[in-house]
Amino acid sequence: MEDGARLILRSSAALREKEKVLVLVDRDTKPMGDAFLAAARSLGTDPVMICILPREHDAEEPPELVATAMESADLILLATRKSLTHTHARRQANRAGARVISMPGITA
């Protein structure tokens, strides 16, 4: 899994050393988050992973504390069961300059 995560970080995200990386997961997708965390570390970053309670439906906002963290990241990996793509938190993070890769429903 880590090799696949590293490929995504290099090719799709164009991850650069020392960027601030946030990996957002829920309990169902934590194993994938662990792979992205390890891959990001191997590429010279000090990533942070936050595990939230699974959302009830797509586009449900994450907790306010998570939204604040998203605004300060360079790259956000949304590896959650439900989609966070169409949330205010994601839009605000993009406006603040973050790149976002959304992978709702990702499995190992």
Kindly label every feature range from the protein language model.
Residues 1-108:
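Active-site bordering "gate/hinge" segments
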